[in-house]
Amino acid sequence: MIQQETYLNVADNSGAKKLLCIRVLGGSNRRYGSVGDVIIATVKDATPNMAVKKSDVVRAVIVRTRKSIRRESGMSIRFDDNAAVLINQDGNPRGTRVFGPVARELRDKNFTKIVSLAPEVL
């Protein structure tokens, strides 16, 4: 459950380390985002000499949340952190690697490139 002012870790090698959520996309009055939702965020911490700099405004897709996700089968899944992967306007990841597990719900939302780069899909 990600909302405005939520801090997220970055799960790729684009150069950003921490993000601050500015907006959850998908409706004028949308309050919360979950796995697979696109957010607008600002970079709060970044690696030097990379493409993404501190204070850049970026798009990202949420890949892990601390809030548990209910599945159709009745199972629920929860992660240890809130994390996102930076994407461009086309929905493709800006980095070339994805770190840590990602949720299977990303495949349903057509983020197949992120799913294929991830080391583990839960």
UniProtKB/Swiss-Prot annotation:
<dbReference type="Pfam" id="PF00238">
    <property type="entry name" value="Ribosomal_L14"/>
</dbReference>
<dbReference type="InterPro" id="IPR005745">
    <property type="entry name" value="Ribosomal_uL14_bac-type"/>
</dbReference>
<dbReference type="GO" id="GO:0070180">
    <property type="term" value="F:large ribosomal subunit rRNA binding"/>
</dbReference>
<dbReference type="InterPro" id="IPR019972">
    <property type="entry name" value="Ribosomal_uL14_CS"/>
</dbReference>
<dbReference type="GO" id="GO:0006412">
    <property type="term" value="P:translation"/>
</dbReference>
<dbReference type="GO" id="GO:0003735">
    <property type="term" value="F:structural constituent of ribosome"/>
</dbReference>
<comment type="similarity">
    <text>Belongs to the universal ribosomal protein uL14 family.</text>
</comment>
<comment type="subunit">
    <text>Part of the 50S ribosomal subunit. Forms a cluster with proteins L3 and L19. In the 70S ribosome, L14 and L19 interact and together make contacts with the 16S rRNA in bridges B5 and B8.</text>
</comment>
<keyword id="KW-0699">rRNA-binding</keyword>
<keyword id="KW-0689">Ribosomal protein</keyword>
<keyword id="KW-0694">RNA-binding</keyword>
<dbReference type="InterPro" id="IPR036853">
    <property type="entry name" value="Ribosomal_uL14_sf"/>
</dbReference>
<keyword id="KW-0687">Ribonucleoprotein</keyword>
<dbReference type="GO" id="GO:0022625">
    <property type="term" value="C:cytosolic large ribosomal subunit"/>
</dbReference>
<protein>
    <recommendedName>
        <fullName>Large ribosomal subunit protein uL14</fullName>
    </recommendedName>
</protein>
<comment type="function">
    <text>Binds to 23S rRNA. Forms part of two intersubunit bridges in the 70S ribosome.</text>
</comment>
<dbReference type="InterPro" id="IPR000218">
    <property type="entry name" value="Ribosomal_uL14"/>
</dbReference>
